[in-house]
Amino acid sequence: MEKVIVRDLAKKFMWTIVTGDSNSLNRPLTLADTNRPGLELAGYFPDTQTKRLVVLGDKEIGYIEEQMDEISQRRSFEFLTGDNTPCIVIAHGHECPPVLKEIAKRKNFPVFKTEHQTSHAIVSITNYLDECLAESVVIHGELVRVFGVGVLITGKSGMGKSEIALELIKRGHQLVGDDRIDCYKIHDDLVGRTTPMLEGFMELRGVEEGRIDRKRLELSIYRMFKIVRKFNELRK
């Protein structure tokens, strides 16, 4: 599980900052879910998950402008800008309500604006946080995509995992990662990937580490196979 702060999201999605200084961007995010504060704007606060990032969309902004007086806004925004809440994101390019802007400035609370539609913003935020906050483990093995399905080959060192993966690649399947595989549990799914430094590389016993050229995959694999076969013949 990675440590994620508001600054990471603001940089990732290129949000426009409305309020909050550099220190306010260090607030942590510990939950992937977001909160569209319908009941909170209506003045009902029990059972609110305050650690969720708050998103204000068309409906919320419309309700604030048309149905809430200044007293109601102050009560709701004081609650929504609490210490546990990471930040507020205003979607669809809406302007920040003046009362929220005033309170957020006073509390040095981060408020952002994005041009993305509300649903798009929520999906993007949730997917990103799901991956960053997922439980993870490092496994020694080979991860290959076989007929569109991820296959993780594990076993003791030196038993031939890389050679098996190479045989699969020769037959048109895809290498995902060699040696070190980072496995994540996202909801009920297991997702595996290699580290960026090792992406596209394979290491075989007796052969220097070689790069799998995706644009010339068949030629690269054929050359590597010839090297491996020649090396094996020399060992006999």
Regions found by a protein language model. Give the residues of each.
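Glycine-rich phosphate-binding P-loop
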Residues: 148-176
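Gly/Thr-rich phosphate-binding loop signature of adenosyl cofactor/nucleotide-binding cores
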Residues: 1-81
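Short, basic, glycine/proline-bearing loop/turn elements
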Residues: 57-65, 84-87, 200-205
